[in-house]
Amino acid sequence: AAYRARERLRDDTTGQTKDYTRKAEQPVLFSGIYTPKNAPAWAKDRGALWNAAERAEDEHNRKSRRVAITAQDMDMALMDELTLEQNRRLLQDFIREQFTRHGYAVDANIHGPDRDGDQRNIHAHLLITMRTLNVQGFSPVKRQMDRKELSQWVNHWREAWAKTASR
């Protein structure tokens, strides 16, 4: 999360601080946290969100810590024909329809192209919580997916992104 947002975040579990504030190969054009309507106010803070997600995973997944997954990472190409604001709204609609309406929090960052790369490479990075979030915090239960089901969801998200972008 710190790397994607080019921020400085502290991991409460390890005590380590990750500082990517000076990383500038790809500028962050937009950064935001999207949460379900009934999420607690602290969930809008990137550090609080991911530290809580890690705590929930440790607390509710004691048997399989070594295979615990806190978030799903998704990279998405955006359209260079659109303005930054149009791309942000497009991304926001997709996030709302696919994730926050279903109880998941999303950490979204829009990056510009590399200085020396293709200047049309405007893209977004999404970190989606694996547990739903409500006023009490993260759910003790999370959806378990095998490779086949995850592949089906990825195909669903691709189709949903195509429909949202076409709209």
Which sequence ranges carry the predicted segments?
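N-terminal nicking endonuclease/strand-transfer module with a His-rich metal-binding environment
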Residues: 1-167
